[in-house]
Amino acid sequence: MSEINISAVAVKELREKTGAGMMDCKKALIETSGNFEEAIDFLRKKGLAAAAKKAGRIASEGLTAAKVDGLTGVVIEVNSETDFVARNEQFQDLVKEIANLAVIAKTIDTLKTFKMQSGKSVEEEVIENIATIGENLTLRRMDVLEISEGAIGSYVHNEVVPNLGKISVLVGLVSNAKDKAKLEALAKQIAVHVAGNNPQSIDDSSLDQALVERERKVFFEKSKEEGKPDNIIAKMVEGRIRKFFSEVVLLQQNFLFEPKLTVAEVIKNAEKELGAEIKIAKFIRYELGEGIEHEEKNFADEVAAITQG
């Protein structure tokens, strides 16, 4: 049976029966000459039917990874349902290989099409691992950091194996400083700082202004409730905004390794020592599962889920 003879109705029915994707269902029907039951078996053998059923489950565990290649760095997050799978060597190898390809791919859509050592695309390999590992897995996100010159510092917190862990950070320092070792050491220290202090922006001008206005409004209302005069309120609000900046803006935060200095002051000192300008071009901080709504289950539900597979 040729591809043109596969009806949309048959594809739709197979999708409803297996939960697999439309294109996978169409391919299965083509490969099996339109035999419905054989098409189901085809999808099962490929792990696609099982994968689709598991894809409805929330994957908020897993691993983040940081990979640096010269002046390019990438951070990715691959999710699983349980922390147990994150300690699985097969899963770790999958994340490592995806991270290595991500440095070249630059975008997540391109990354999904890249061929892995198995010959399958990244997307296909993730689906196959869903079937073999037995949990929903998701290549959730990636971000790239590229600089023209300087150094990229990387740090992974709570590593399970090198470069894989719960929090992954990259910091790009643009500089023509000759002492690359010292520049790299500074980039690494700032990456550790970012992991621990979770800044929201590099400087106050790049901070989300909606966030600033929301904080300003909260401070204003709070000061007003305290019965302060308007001229005093204005000064109090500005003081609290400055404190807010010192908490969430990277350059204004107290440096983790030298708490008496801000990150900006540490960079200024490094510029004097290295005889070159240093600028933070970008930082990336991925914390595992951030922004994912975790599924709430009671004990009875968990037992039922386990017994039902």
UniProtKB/Swiss-Prot annotation:
Q: What's the superkingdom here?
A: Bacteria
What is any Pfam family matched here? EF_TS
Q: What keywords are annotated for this sequence in UniProt?
A: Cytoplasm, Elongation factor, Protein biosynthesis
Q: Which SUPFAM superfamilies match?
A: Elongation factor Ts (EF-Ts), dimerisation domain, UBA-like
Whether Protein biosynthesis counts among this entry's keywords is yes
Q: What's one GO-annotated cellular component?
A: cytoplasm
Residue ranges of region Involved in Mg(2+) ion dislocation from EF-Tu?
82-85
| Gene3D superfamilies, per database record | 1.10.286.20, DNA helicase RuvA subunit, C-terminal domain (1.10.8.10), Elongation factor Ts, dimerisation domain (3.30.479.20)
> Which GO molecular function entries does the Swiss-Prot or TrEMBL record give?
translation elongation factor activity
Give the InterPro entries listed for this entry: EF-Ts_dimer_sf, Transl_elong_EFTs/EF1B, Transl_elong_EFTs/EF1B_dimer, Transl_elong_Ts_CS, UBA-like_sf
The places in or outside the cell where this protein is found are: Cytoplasm
Under HAMAP family, the record lists:
EF_Ts (MF_00050)
Q: What does this protein do?
A: Associates with the EF-Tu.GDP complex and induces the exchange of GDP to GTP. It remains bound to the aminoacyl-tRNA.EF-Tu.GTP complex up to the GTP hydrolysis stage on the ribosome.
Q: Which PANTHER family does the entry link to?
A: ELONGATION FACTOR TS (PTHR11741), ELONGATION FACTOR TS, MITOCHONDRIAL (PTHR11741:SF0)
Spell out the family assignment given in the record's similarity comment. Belongs to the EF-Ts family.
Protein name in the entry: Elongation factor Ts
Organism (species): Rickettsia rickettsii (strain Sheila Smith)
